Design a protein with these regions (language model features):
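N-terminal active-site wall of soluble small-molecule enzyme domains
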Residues: 63-70, 76-124
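Active-site beta-loop-alpha junctions enriched in small/polar residues
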Residues: 36-39, 81-85, 108-110, 134-136, ...
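Gly-rich Lys/Arg/Thr-decorated short loops/hinges at beta-loop-alpha junctions or inter-strand turns
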Residues: 36-50, 70-76, 95-98, 156-157
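Well-ordered, non-membrane alpha-helical segments in soluble/globular domains
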Residues: 51-66, 88-92, 166-175
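Solvent-exposed alpha-helices and their adjacent loops that cap or buttress functional pockets
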Residues: 23-25, 96-97, 122-124, 146-148
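Structural preference for beta-strand elements that scaffold enzyme active sites
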Residues: 28-33, 73-79, 102-104, 126-130, ...
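N-terminal amphipathic alpha-helix/helix-capping segment at the start of soluble metabolic enzymes
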Residues: 2-63
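Conserved anion-binding
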Residues: 124-128, 134-175
């Protein structure tokens, strides 16, 4: 058996979001599957402004991801993409009915992401939600929204468009 030695500056910790554990030492926990639904151009979405979608097809996708999770032993997180807050509300209502685990909330629209935080708290989903993402593009208003709401899990996107690669990512994290 080949052993790979990892050395970390900081202690590796785990987090638990709605029963799914993330992090820790490499190999300590299984990889988490994150399947995206309702993304731009997704064939099941009929109107991405209003959140109209083919419910039966969406249910099949969530069921299939659940099956893959059982087959592989890897837990899964539902990654919900929404262009608008009204669409997100409909997608969250759907997710609450068909899925009991954690979900990632995502949008290319900064205002939708910020308003989503209030919506998640209002609907009581904050403890199941993972915000996507804190990045170099996060402005003060979005950061304030993160601090003022109950969602306490987020993805940090350490991408540096001015300096792609590990060194650039490290500079983003350090600054």
């Amino acid at each position: 058996r080949n052993e790979i030695m990892f050395r970390f500056k900081n202690e590796q910790t785990t987090v638990n979001v709605a029963g799914v554990r993330f992090g820790g030492q490499p190999g300590e926990l299984p990889t988490v599957l994150c399947g995206t639904i309702f993304y731009q151009g997704h064939r099941i979405v009929e109107d991405d402004e209003r959140g109209i979608f083919d419910r039966a097809a969406a249910e099949r996708l969530v069921l299939r991801q659940s099956e893959l999770s059982s087959e592989t032993g890897c837990p899964f997180v539902l990654h919900i993409y929404a262009r608008t807050v009204p669409a997100l509300r409909k997608y969250l209502d759907f997710a609450e009915e068909v899925w009991s685990g954690p979900f990632i909330v995502d949008s290319a629209e900064r205002s939708t992401r910020s308003l989503a935080l209030s919506l998640l708290s209002e609907l009581g989903y904050a403890d199941k939600a993972i915000y996507n993402s804190i990045s170099i593009a996060t402005d003060d208003a979005e950061a304030r929204a993160l601090l003022e709401n109950e969602v306490d899990s987020a993805i940090i996107l350490a991408y540096n468009p001015g300096e792609p690669g590990v060194e650039g990512a490290m500079r983003i994290l350090e600054n």
